[in-house]
């Protein structure tokens, strides 16, 4: 009798802990605390695992979009200071559209994201877009939700991102952000 009671209590406690860890899917974009546990779902999108992402990547079934932010060069650096951007290693062949996963985007960032998705998809709103960042990063959740709001109908959200990819010992490559309009740099893709 005591053993059954103990088992029942332990099961109830485990269920309570799991319930606390589950993050509900919000209706709106996440506006702050972007590095935090994410929900298990995104309405309208397919949520994929690292195994799913690897299959899509190997079979060239979709376009991979990395939305990890990139810190800007500080404006107040002393003259002569050499600035080196931190390298970004992501899934080979990805288009890196930094700073496009914030909850609210400036008009220029929104245009940059729209243009990047249009270029990546070849203007086809049914092309599979695999959107990712890092694990426990709301940037990818926001960006995938935003892509659907633009009319993209085949969006996959990869919440494990580059950390899940790297844990699976899959190849990574150093990447540069897609150029923003007017920055004068050649497009990486």
Regions found by a protein language model. Give the residues of each.
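Surface-exposed acidic loop/strand-edge motifs in secreted or periplasmic proteins
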Residues: 67-71, 76
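Rhodanese-like catalytic fold shared by cysteine-dependent sulfurtransferases
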Residues: 17-51, 56-59, 75-130, 135-189
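Bacterial N-terminal signal peptides
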Residues: 7-14
């Amino acid at each position: 009798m005591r053993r059954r009671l103990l088992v029942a209590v332990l099961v109830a406690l485990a269920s309570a802990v799991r319930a606390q860890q589950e993050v509900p899917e919000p209706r709106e974009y996440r506006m702050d605390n972007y590095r935090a546990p994410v929900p298990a779902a995104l309405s309208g999108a397919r949520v994929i695992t690292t195994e799913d992402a690897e299959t899509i990547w190997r079979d060239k079934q979709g376009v991979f979009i990395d939305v990890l932010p990139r810190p800007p060069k500080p404006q107040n650096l002393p003259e002569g200071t050499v600035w080196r951007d931190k390298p970004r290693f992501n899934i080979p062949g990805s288009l890196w559209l930094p700073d496009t996963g914030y909850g609210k985007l400036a008009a220029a960032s929104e245009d940059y994201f729209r243009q990047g998705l249009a270029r990546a998809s070849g203007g086809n709103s049914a092309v599979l877009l695999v959107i990712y960042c890092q694990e426990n990063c709301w940037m990818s959740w926001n960006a995938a939700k935003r892509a659907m709001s633009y009319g993209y109908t085949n969006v996959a959200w990869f919440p494990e991102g580059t950390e899940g990819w790297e844990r699976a010992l899959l190849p990574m490559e150093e990447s540069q952000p897609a150029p923003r309009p007017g920055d004068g740099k050649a497009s990486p893709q």
